[in-house]
Amino acid sequence: MVYVTGDLHGDYSRFKRPEMKKLRAGDILLVCGDFGFIWDNSKQEQTVLKKLSEKKYTIAFVDGCHENFDLLQQYRLVRWRGGVARLIAPNIFHLQRGEIYTIENQKYFAFGGGHSQDYEYRRDTGNWWRQEQPTHDEIRRAIRNLNRNQATVDYIITHEPPASLKDCLGVDVQQRLEIHSFFEDIIKECDYKKWFFGKCHMDRFIPMKFYAVFQDVLPVTDERD
């Protein structure tokens, strides 16, 4: 079974919460950005990654705004579920922007990245990475992949919400980047069942198809699917 959750920020205690107990061997947990367990390559971090690698289920995440992209990009690219991902551990994968994965006969469009609200502070302290912001080329590649699939997928996994959702939720309403316009185009031009996103640090359903996820661990499919 496939589940989805929100930003983890390298907090291993999240895996001890009751919501995570539903995960079983063979399940897949999708994380909507800010995975955060690959940050400083410390011994403590390596210990935590080892614990995660011993889980009986698979963890697959899109990147968010609080990631060490220099470290992430050191992991090799592999084919996974019909798309390309970085192999972190045998059961941990970094989903690449614009890729489409087939999981349990369902198609998932993944697109990480975004813009840090604390950009100026993090830039000054040396822990901000330009790669957090999706490039025009990444967006163009995503469009090509969607077109190859007749602009139809089952589920969308992102870190940022579309611009119209930011207005609805009252978060970052002044912030408009190319990625937000791209997501608005997806709303208008693509067919999909549900769209899950992180970043906003809230758990909320926005009718009819959108899910802001943070601490919830939601099954992707339900009876209506």
Which ranges hold each PLM region?
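Active-site-proximal loop/helix segment associated with metal-binding centers of metalloenzymes
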Residues: 83, 90, 103-177
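Beta-strand-turn-beta hairpins that frame and shape the catalytic cleft
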Residues: 1-3, 99-110, 155, 207-211
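Structural motif
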Residues: 4, 28-32, 155-159, 196
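Conserved beta-sheet core of the metallophosphoesterase superfamily
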Residues: 58-62, 84-90, 163-225
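Catalytic metal-binding/acid-base residues of hydrolase active sites
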Residues: 8-9, 35-36, 65-68, 114-115, ...
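Core catalytic region of metal-dependent phosphoesterases/phosphodiesterases
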Residues: 5, 10-103, 172, 179-183, ...
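A structural signal for the main folded, soluble domain(s) of proteins
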Residues: 21-23, 103-105, 145-152, 211-213, ...
